[in-house]
């Protein structure tokens, strides 16, 4: 036919210094060949969504899946600052983390690819669930296709988050986190767009 492979990912480089936590909702991650593994806890007990706990093996490539969410992001706990990304899941289901690796194998790229700000990581949004490779034709995870005279259009947004001690969920209007401690849970909210009127919070039917 006339269809041609279509492949689109948006890539942002972010710093890794500052106790970085990746807020990527999901229960599994895909490798490039379609292999599925546990997320966010890896073998044996690594918290893969914490940059500093990826200090094993070589580079990491996590295509996180398993939850139909329209957001993901990251948070530097030492800085009290983070970022979020939103898009309709049907438009951008792919969300990927790339880590060069914390061993000398990976950290050599800090010298080769950066200036003086330290190592970086990549966070990416994609039109597909993973970045497939040649053997992916044997899996459900393949390149998409685009027909002649067809146009694809979508919207995605990036925004800052501050003072929430992490990100549990985000929309185009606000981001929030629930922080446990001292026998209670604290709701922390960061407005992304102007918010007016009453904000009603419910839990198990209680206001």
PLM feature spans:
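Charged, extended alpha-helical/coiled-coil interaction regions used as scaffolds
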Residues: 175-181
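A contiguous, surface-exposed recognition patch within enzymatic or periplasmic domains that forms
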Residues: 2-151, 159
């Amino acid at each position: 036919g006339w269809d041609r492979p279509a492949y689109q990912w948006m890539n942002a480089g972010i710093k890794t210094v500052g106790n970085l936590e990746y807020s990527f909702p999901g229960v599994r991650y895909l490798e490039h060949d379609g292999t599925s593994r546990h997320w966010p806890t890896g073998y044996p007990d690594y918290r893969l969504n914490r940059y500093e706990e990826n200090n094993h093996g070589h580079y990491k490539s996590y295509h996180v899946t398993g939850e139909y969410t329209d957001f993901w992001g990251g948070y530097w706990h030492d800085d009290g600052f983070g970022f979020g990304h939103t898009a309709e899941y049907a438009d951008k289901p792919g969300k990927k983390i790339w880590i060069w690796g914390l061993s000398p194998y990976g950290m050599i790229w800090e010298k080769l690819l950066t200036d003086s700000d330290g190592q970086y990581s990549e966070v990416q949004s994609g039109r597909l669930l993973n970045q497939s490779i040649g053997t992916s034709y044997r899996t459900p995870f393949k390149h998409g296709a685009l027909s002649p005279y067809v146009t694809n259009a979508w919207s995605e947004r990036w925004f800052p988050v501050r003072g929430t001690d992490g990100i549990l969920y985000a929309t185009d209007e606000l981001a929030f986190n629930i922080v446990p401690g001292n026998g209670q849970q604290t709701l922390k909210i960061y407005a992304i767009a102007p918010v007016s009127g009453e904000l009603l919070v419910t839990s198990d039917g209680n206001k």
